[in-house]
Regions:
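N-terminal Rossmann-fold NAD(P) dinucleotide-binding loop
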Residues: 4-5
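Rossmann-fold cofactor-recognition segment
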Residues: 20-35
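NAD(P)H-binding glycine-rich loop region in Rossmannoid oxidoreductase-like domains
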Residues: 31-71
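NAD(P)-cofactor binding segment of oxidoreductase domains
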Residues: 49, 63-91
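Catalytic helix-loop patch of NAD(P)-dependent Rossmann-fold dehydrogenases
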Residues: 70, 74-78, 85, 98-139, ...
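NAD(P)-dependent short-chain dehydrogenase/reductase
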Residues: 128-188
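Mid/C-terminal beta-alpha module of Rossmann-like enzyme folds, strongest
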Residues: 185-186, 192-247
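Amphipathic terminal alpha-helices
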Residues: 272-286
């Protein structure tokens, strides 16, 4: 996936990397096979395991709970047990979807969890599974994107070229977070954790600032026009979440408070526009 790809770059200077995914033939990277991924850990005997695999099809998860549970929780538990036996570190990614998305205040790590959907429920179970390994770093993130593969900006650009009028949701709040940023922060955190094991725990990790999908789309269109891209869209309507009914409920408030992460790892998280503008430069230049 997008984060896994960036991790291969960011983690390279830390040591020898064994990258495993669903299609791997040398080791099992198929998270629908908990025994297989557990065996991979036993065979590789890593010092650090970074798990960027997940069932992220939020709406699909509503109708395939067992499969989502297998990928997001059962296999995580299998890996965590092997990691604990090895004395290895386990780095795992979670989501703001573990919360109910209410209010306007950024969520802190120890706020009450109450997932709105199956995806959130299985990811919460995954956090609890990852914590079976004492040396764990769990990073809750949100609105993840990358220049590589599909993303919201590319979808907006495609629609913006085809349609004169568009409607975009304006009552969900969060911070688009680049896979690059996640991977780089993960590498820093691993370095710190290896020297200071007491930093083990749960952290919120997203870019700084807040936006809505509507404002995010407006930035995409402004940058595209500035780059000379011809867009058909002349009217963009701000609409509520209720205008786009989906099988899975979406949170209104995806803001995460990253104070703990920034203090612990002595890092400053850039504003969300920094990474998004960089990604746009990359995709518009192609």
């Amino acid at each position: 996936g997008q984060v896994g790809w960036e991790l291969q770059r960011a983690l390279a200077p830390l040591g020898r990397i064994t990258a495993v995914d669903f299609d791997s033939t040398d080791y099992c990277g198929d998270f629908s096979k908990p025994a297989g991924v557990a065996e991979t850990v036993r065979l590789v005997k890593p010092d650090v395991i970074v798990n960027a695999a997940a069932h992220t099809a939020v709406d699909k998860a509503e109708s395939e709970r067992e499969f989502a549970e297998l990928l997001n929780a059962t296999s995580v538990a299998a890996i965590a047990k092997e990691a604990e036996a090895l004395g290895a570190w386990l780095v795992h990614y979670s989501t703001d979807y573990v919360f109910d998305g209410s209010g306007e205040r950024p969520w802190v790590e120890n706020d009450q969890t109450a997932p709105l959907n199956v995806y959130g429920e299985t990811k919460l179970a995954g956090e609890q599974a990852a914590a079976l390994c004492a040396r764990h770093l769990i990073f809750r993130t949100s609105w993840v994107y990358a220049a590589r593969g599909a993303n919201f900006a590319k979808t907006m650009l495609r629609f913006g070229k085809e349609r004169s009028e568009m409607s975009v949701i304006n009552d969900q709040f969060g911070a688009p977070t680049g896979a690059e940023l996640l991977a780089d922060c993960t590498a820093h955190a691993i370095r710190t954790a290896q020297a200071k094991p007491e930093v083990a725990g749960l952290y919120h990790l997203i870019a700084s600032g807040t936006t809505t999908w509507f404002d995010y789309a407006q930035l995409v269109f402004a940058k595209a026009r500035a780059a000379g891209v011809e867009l058909a869209v002349t009217q963009v309507n701000a609409v509520p979440t209720s205008a786009f009914p989906t099988p899975a409920k979406r949170p209104h408030n995806s803001r995460l408070d990253t104070t703990k992460f920034q203090r612990t790892f002595n890092l400053r998280l850039p504003d969300w526009t920094v990474g998004v503008e960089r990604m746009l430069t990359e995709i518009l230049g192609k």
